[in-house]
């Protein structure tokens, strides 16, 4: 299982959009995936079409992590049924898994800056039951408080989401320093998987300048491809659709970008993306 936290220091940069875009790409590739919605706003759960019944939300599971039964409390994303019924599903999709550990305001009790080591291990303990998945995506709150640190403690990699703007770039630099300090003290095996430039406006001189600044500051940590601003993204999320099953050329182009981004995220050694996806589907 590869656990990846999707983080940002600043709200409004499209962190949850990147999480759901990567989840959509994983579903299209047939990669068994769990999305853990640690943000108390639970926007990822809504966008993924997760409709919980009697299942515990992730906050309740974190309260008693040793007794938490993850497999019994995850909720399947509504995307799976829709994708399976579309008739155009790629090979391997029938067996694909996209589950959600549903978010709730209850997780907010852990979103404080003074969590001790025992509390930081709560998510790691819950995810001990995640062996059926190849990929776990953790949607973090837009802060560096307890929930984000709990996610980092359970993760193999951290992806930072940033808009190419002055304050977002500065926030990303601070977050990179915070990750380095956190690694030294709590999680020596944690690695920054990279930085996703999101909501990029190709015609904006400011965005072009900030992207060049990000390339200079972060080098190879700036992941490719960049994700352009998607005018209908709120409509897609509001309808609880995956980007891969939304009609139109702009959605199709965005889906291809998330396919490439997922391949680069899971495949840092540079093997061709097509081979990477093929290996995962037929493993």
Which residue stretches match the model-derived regions?
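P-loop NTP-binding core
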Residues: 1-283
């Amino acid at each position: 299982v590869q656990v990846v936290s999707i983080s940002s220091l600043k709200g409004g940069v499209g962190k949850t959009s990147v999480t759901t875009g990567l989840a959509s790409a994983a579903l299209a590739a047939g990669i068994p995936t769990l999305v853990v919605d640690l943000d108390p706003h639970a926007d990822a759960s809504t966008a993924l079409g997760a409709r919980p019944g009697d299942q515990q939300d992730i906050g309740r599971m974190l309260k008693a992590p040793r007794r938490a039964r993850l497999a019994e409390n995850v909720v399947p994303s509504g995307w799976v049924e829709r994708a399976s019924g579309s008739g155009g599903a790629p090979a391997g999709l029938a067996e694909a898994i996209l589950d959600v550990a549903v978010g709730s305001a209850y997780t907010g009790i852990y979103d404080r800056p003074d969590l001790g080591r025992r509390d930081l291990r709560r998510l790691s303990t819950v995810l001990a039951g995640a062996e059926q998945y190849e990929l776990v995506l953790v949607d973090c709150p837009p802060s560096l408080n307890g929930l984000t640190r709990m996610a980092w403690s359970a993760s193999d990699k951290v992806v930072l989401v940033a808009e190419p703007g002055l304050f977002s770039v500065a926030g990303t630099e601070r977050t990179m320093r915070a990750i380095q300090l956190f690694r030294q003290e709590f999680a020596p095996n944690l690695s920054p998987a990279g930085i996703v430039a999101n909501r990029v406006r190709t015609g904006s001189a400011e965005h072009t300048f900030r992207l060049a600044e990000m390339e200079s500051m972060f080098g190879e940590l700036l992941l490719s491809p960049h994700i352009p601003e998607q005018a209908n993204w709120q409509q897609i999320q509001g309808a609880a659709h995956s980007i891969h099953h939304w009609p139109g050329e702009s959605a199709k182009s965005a889906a291809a970008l998330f396919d490439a981004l997922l391949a680069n995220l899971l495949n840092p050694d540079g093997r061709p993306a097509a081979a990477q996806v093929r290996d995962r589907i037929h493993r």
